[in-house]
Amino acid sequence: MSGTKKVGSAGRFGPRYGLKIRRRVAAVEAKMRQKHVCPVCGRRAVRRISTGIWQCKKCGAIFAGGAYLPVTPAGKVAKRVVE
């Protein structure tokens, strides 16, 4: 995997775009690639399939979420209003 010590996976951009933006991209990608909690079975086994599409490796549940995280701040508010 390409990367650097300072910006990790955003090292693929080389010197372009500036350090601050590359650090921000690296932080978002790190959050996106970690395992998340499944809303169906509760296990930490959710991975991103595509933009906004998430799948639990344990129970096989496929659901829509945010582009980079399965639960967005707006989604949390909407869920609270519905309940």
UniProtKB/Swiss-Prot annotation:
GO molecular function, one term: zinc ion binding
Cofactor: how and how many bound: Binds 1 zinc ion per subunit.
Pfam families cross-referenced by the UniProt entry: Ribosomal_L37ae
SUPFAM superfamilies: Zn-binding ribosomal proteins
Necessary cofactors: Zn(2+)
GO cellular component: ribonucleoprotein complex; ribosome
Annotated coiled-coil segments of the chain: none
Keyword Zinc-finger in record: yes
Residues annotated for Zn(2+) binding in this entry: 38, 41, 56, 59
Quaternary structure note: Part of the 50S ribosomal subunit.
HAMAP family per the UniProt record, alphabetical: Ribosomal_eL43
Similarity field: Belongs to the eukaryotic ribosomal protein eL43 family. Putative zinc-binding subfamily.
Task of the protein: Binds to the 23S rRNA.
The protein's name: Large ribosomal subunit protein eL43
Organism of provenance: Pyrococcus abyssi (strain GE5 / Orsay)
